Regions:
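Accessible peptide chain termini
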Residues: 1, 223-224
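Basic/hydrophobic alpha-helical interface regions
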Residues: 1-122, 131-140, 151-154
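Surface-exposed beta-strand edges and flanking loops
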Residues: 23-25, 209, 226
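Pan-zinc metallopeptidase signature
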Residues: 109-223
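Conserved small/polar residues in nucleotide/adenosyl-binding loops
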Residues: 225-232
Length: 233
């Protein structure tokens, strides 16, 4: 039995159903909760422990993520649902704890999340920091206000909890962006120059608003759950 066949069998055993497991040249793993298809990427340098992590994660969606339409932003739902299903998989299959820990460690060592050269992780969007934190980076910092949402993500029990928190987080992120834009839109007096001083050229001062990340509200059903894509597969 090949390694691919072993991982496919493992996925079916964990999910307790005859899932369709496909191995494709794709950037990351995913699970289609509607068609019950688990897709695993074909990566050249990934270890068996990383594949155990991917299988454990996507089977978590197979077991615990319902096949229903949602009215919350998909990106936010995905992050929070990942937290919930991984916690539940570790509770259901304690032996997977080591696979998750060592698998994420390997992914971080390979800069899977693409933030190795980010000077300050505190500057990236809040929802991304939540994702990185729960995927093995406990050095991520949160403000006391943000920590309330992080703790809430850790306590989600049902998919309904996930939806509600995703909407709250989305609104929180929007409020922060709106406040930032209002701050950038404040009229700043033009600098005054003494025209009597010779040899001094008038320098134009530009104030550019900080570009905000686009939190898109997804209208489509939340059916396909994917793992983060690596830089190099």
């Amino acid at each position: 039995m090949t390694n691919s066949e072993v991982k496919g069998t493992l996925a079916r055993l964990l999910a307790t159903e005859n899932l369709t497991v496909e191995h494709r040249k794709v950037s990351t793993a995913s699970f289609d909760v509607n068609n019950r298809v688990l897709i695993l990427p074909i990566w050249k340098n990934a270890s068996s422990i990383v594949y155990d992590l991917l299988v454990g994660h996507e089977v978590g969606h197979a077991l615990y993520t319902p096949n229903i339409p949602v009215d919350a932003p998909k990106a936010f739902v995905n992050v929070i649902e990942d937290v919930r299903i991984e916690r539940m998989m570790k509770q259901t299959y304690p032996g997977l704890k080591k696979s998750f820990f060592e698998g994420y460690k390997e992914l971080w060592d390979q800069d899977f999340f693409g933030v190795k050269y980010t000077d300050n992780l505190d500057t990236i969007p809040f929802i991304d920091r939540i994702n990185l934190y729960f995927k093995g980076n406990n050095t991520i910092n949160f403000t006391p206000e943000e920590q309330v949402y992080v703790d809430a993500a850790e306590r989600t029990k049902s998919f309904d909890d996930v939806e509600k928190l995703a909407i709250e987080l989305y609104q929180y992120a929007q409020d922060k962006e709106d406040a930032k834009e209002e701050s950038n839109d404040v009229d700043v007096p033009s600098p005054k120059f003494d025209q009597s001083q010779s040899g001094d050229s008038e320098e134009e001062v530009q104030f550019e608003p900080t570009s905000s990340d686009d939190y898109e509200d997804q209208d489509q059903d939340c059916l396909l759950y994917t793992s983060p894509s690596p830089r190099d597969s």
